[in-house]
């Protein structure tokens, strides 16, 4: 198999794992396959962000910007099946609803959403809507670019947690899909550098440095937070990290726009 074909299959594997976009080829959905595909998690976010940006751009000609923002948010949920939002809700329920590590993991496996999960999801969506609506006051491109950056960078930095932290869900009863559980240096470098290049192309050197440093700090705090609760990460906690880091991107972009 050629290198190009092998890398294309890894990208498609990452795409089908994180989205509901169908692909016309048979792929290796094992944990090892996802380990190798992890380098493309950020670029999958780029595609999701581009589609959301296109939805916003087209609909803002017809509807108020706030409505276009909601439609773009709906588009991302439809594309991903609410994959990361589900992780945020499960993590909030688990971390908020128990004190013991095993009980937290047990709650996170439950498909039902509790009060902590409902609150976390509602507040995250409200904040996302408000931040994107505020960006829309500056320009259409600020929202479109923000969506691309938010989905790219949040997935890249959340996935980078796999590199130096421990996967803690080994039980056969987990409701989660197979998950990437390890990442080599070359994979994490490609993951972060590809996201950084996209950020550089869209924002420039100064803004890129501010965004990346902020995300690195936020990523470190989130990794410590989940390690303190359960001793490592699960698919749910990575989903929660993605949602939180996406909000961090929008917050930083809004601050940068307000200072320009």
UniProtKB/Swiss-Prot annotation:
<dbReference type="GO" id="GO:0008818">
    <property type="term" value="F:cobalamin 5'-phosphate synthase activity"/>
</dbReference>
<keyword id="KW-1133">Transmembrane helix</keyword>
<dbReference type="GO" id="GO:0009236">
    <property type="term" value="P:cobalamin biosynthetic process"/>
</dbReference>
<keyword id="KW-0997">Cell inner membrane</keyword>
<comment type="function">
    <text>Joins adenosylcobinamide-GDP and alpha-ribazole to generate adenosylcobalamin (Ado-cobalamin). Also synthesizes adenosylcobalamin 5'-phosphate from adenosylcobinamide-GDP and alpha-ribazole 5'-phosphate.</text>
</comment>
<keyword id="KW-0812">Transmembrane</keyword>
<protein>
    <recommendedName>
        <fullName>Adenosylcobinamide-GDP ribazoletransferase</fullName>
        <ecNumber>2.7.8.26</ecNumber>
    </recommendedName>
</protein>
<keyword id="KW-1003">Cell membrane</keyword>
<keyword id="KW-0169">Cobalamin biosynthesis</keyword>
<comment type="similarity">
    <text>Belongs to the CobS family.</text>
</comment>
<dbReference type="Pfam" id="PF02654">
    <property type="entry name" value="CobS"/>
</dbReference>
<keyword id="KW-0808">Transferase</keyword>
<feature type="transmembrane region" description="Helical">
    <location>
        <begin position="117"/>
        <end position="137"/>
    </location>
</feature>
<keyword id="KW-0460">Magnesium</keyword>
<feature type="transmembrane region" description="Helical">
    <location>
        <begin position="43"/>
        <end position="63"/>
    </location>
</feature>
<feature type="transmembrane region" description="Helical">
    <location>
        <begin position="237"/>
        <end position="257"/>
    </location>
</feature>
<feature type="transmembrane region" description="Helical">
    <location>
        <begin position="143"/>
        <end position="163"/>
    </location>
</feature>
<dbReference type="GO" id="GO:0005886">
    <property type="term" value="C:plasma membrane"/>
</dbReference>
<keyword id="KW-0472">Membrane</keyword>
<comment type="pathway">
    <text>Cofactor biosynthesis; adenosylcobalamin biosynthesis; adenosylcobalamin from cob(II)yrinate a,c-diamide: step 7/7.</text>
</comment>
<dbReference type="InterPro" id="IPR003805">
    <property type="entry name" value="CobS"/>
</dbReference>
<feature type="transmembrane region" description="Helical">
    <location>
        <begin position="197"/>
        <end position="217"/>
    </location>
</feature>
<dbReference type="GO" id="GO:0051073">
    <property type="term" value="F:adenosylcobinamide-GDP ribazoletransferase activity"/>
</dbReference>
<feature type="transmembrane region" description="Helical">
    <location>
        <begin position="64"/>
        <end position="84"/>
    </location>
</feature>
């Amino acid at each position: 198999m050629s290198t190009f074909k092998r890398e294309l299959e890894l990208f498609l594997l990452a795409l089908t794992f994180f989205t509901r976009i169908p692909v016309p080829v048979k792929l290796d959905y094992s944990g090892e396959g996802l380990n190798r595909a992890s380098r493309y998690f950020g670029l999958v976010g780029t595609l999701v962000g581009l589609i959301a940006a296109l939805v916003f751009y087209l609909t803002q000609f017809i509807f108020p910007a706030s409505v276009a923002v909601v439609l773009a948010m709906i588009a991302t949920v439809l594309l991903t099946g609410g994959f990361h939002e589900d992780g945020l809700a499960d993590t909030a329920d688990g971390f908020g609803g128990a004190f013991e590590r095993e009980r937290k993991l047990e709650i996170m496996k439950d498909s039902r959403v509790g009060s902590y999960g409902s609150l976390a999801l509602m507040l995250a969506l409200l904040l996302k809507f408000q931040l994107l609506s505020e960006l829309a006051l500056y320009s259409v491109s600020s929202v479109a670019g923000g969506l691309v950056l938010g989905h790219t960078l949040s997935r890249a930095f959340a996935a980078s947690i796999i590199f130096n932290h421990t996967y803690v869900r080994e039980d056969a009863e987990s409701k989660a899909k197979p998950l990437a559980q390890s990442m080599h240096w070359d994979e994490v470098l490609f993951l972060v550098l590809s996201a950084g290049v996209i950020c550089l192309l869209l924002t420039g050197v100064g803004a890129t440095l501010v965004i990346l440093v902020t995300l690195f700090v936020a990523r470190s705090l989130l990794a410590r937070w989940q390690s303190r609760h359960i001793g490592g990460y699960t698919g749910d906690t990575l989903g929660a990290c993605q949602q939180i880091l996406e909000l961090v991107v929008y917050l930083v972009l809004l601050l940068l726009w307000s200072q320009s």
